[in-house]
A protein has these predicted regions:
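Glycine-rich beta-strand-to-loop/alpha-helix junction loops that act as flexible
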Residues: 72-78, 122-125, 248-259
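Short acidic capping loops at alpha-helix termini that bridge into adjacent secondary structure
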Residues: 67-69, 96-97
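Flexible, active-site-adjacent loop/turn segments at secondary-structure boundaries
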Residues: 76, 143-144, 195, 255
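Phosphate-binding/catalytic loop of phosphoryl-transfer enzymes
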Residues: 78-173
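ATP-binding/phosphotransfer module of carbohydrate and carboxylate kinases, centering on a glycine-rich
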Residues: 1-68, 90, 111-116, 160-306
């Protein structure tokens, strides 16, 4: 483990701590990628603070650097200033210049480098973030209980609820119920309910069911189609509101839920009615974190790999 590159150049590290995995990228001040590390999820609200910190450190150390000249840790679940303060205190000092950020801001920063813009994340959770060049504004970012409109968790949860209603006779059974049973290794309603309330319950486990719902929707399942339509429309509505607030006609999207052809089409069509274009971000959130860290120490880094 080392600090600083072998050529004496400063090392800048950006860490993207999401609900599924944690990715760390290390660059030298010349813009060369010199290390990359991957670890488990690090949203403290989903996995707990201790596990989140453990995965952040693992990702950092896996880059080959124990410390760096500047570090930005961009985390999912940073819903309040209290969350950020909590994680700043919990994460060991990885640099004399360490910043803890919301992952959505880092993702937007990767695209705009501080210019105004709007970004939507739809992964395990969801957020619509707007930045006007001075202040940040957000919608939906209040966690799995109070927010996460249009997220993988919300889609998976609705799929699970619909499957329960089908299995207890409240709704006509469709292929969605069969897919949910298979995905949760459940033989019947009792087993499915037990799975949902098990001590091993994790938000990302529910979110993973969104792919099952999307599969059923792609095959024409009416209940699944309704879930996907309502989820995508809900997030698109928030994106349109934020775009008007910030004064932009482009929305960047990030997150695995947008891999759904149906979800993406509904989202894009909704915004097109307001003449707002949708651009799928191809830049890693961890890269945005690198840029935030670099700019924080006055280094205008130009990464040679985006």
């Amino acid at each position: 483990m080392k600090k600083g590159g072998g050529n004496g150049k400063r090392i800048i590290v950006g860490i993207d701590g999401g609900g599924t995995e944690t990715l760390a990228l290390a660059y030298d001040e010349g813009g060369r990628l010199v290390g990359e590390g991957i670890a488990g999820p690090s949203n403290p609200h989903n996995v707990g603070v201790d596990s989140a910190v453990e995965n952040i450190l693992s990702a950092m150390y896996n880059t080959g650097f124990k410390k760096a000249d500047a570090v930005c840790v961009a985390l999912a679940g940073m819903d309040t200033s209290k969350d950020i303060s909590m994680m700043k205190s919990a994460i060991p000092k990885l640099s004399d210049h360490m910043v803890v950020e919301h992952d959505a801001f880092a993702a937007l920063y990767a695209e705009t480098r501080g210019a105004k813009g709007v970004l939507c994340i739809a992964g395990t959770g969801s957020i619509v973030l707007g930045y006007d060049g001075t202040e940040r504004h957000r919608i939906c970012d209040y966690g799995w209980l109070l927010g996460d409109d249009g997220s993988g968790y919300r889609i998976g949860c609705e799929g699970l609820r619909k499957a329960v209603k089908m299995l207890d006779g409240e709704m006509r059974r469709s292929i969605l119920a069969s897919y949910i049973l298979d995905a949760t290794f459940s033989d019947d309603l009792d087993a499915l309910v037990s799975w949902g309330y098990s001590k091993q319950f994790r938000v990302d486990s529910i979110a993973a069911l969104s792919k099952v719902v999307d599969r059923a929707a792609a095959e024409g399942d009416v209940a699944a189609l309704k879930i996907i339509n309502e989820a995508s429309t809900s997030l698109a509505r928030c994106a349109a509101l934020m775009s008007r607030k910030i004064g932009v006609d482009r929305v960047y999207t990030v997150g695995g839920v947008f891999d759904s052809v149906l979800y993406h089409r509904i989202f894009k069509n909704y915004l097109s009615r307001s003449r707002i274009s949708v651009v799928r971000s191809t830049k890693k959130t961890a890269l945005g974190a690198v840029l935030v860290a670099a700019d924080a120490v006055g280094l205008r880094l130009r990464p040679n790999r985006t």
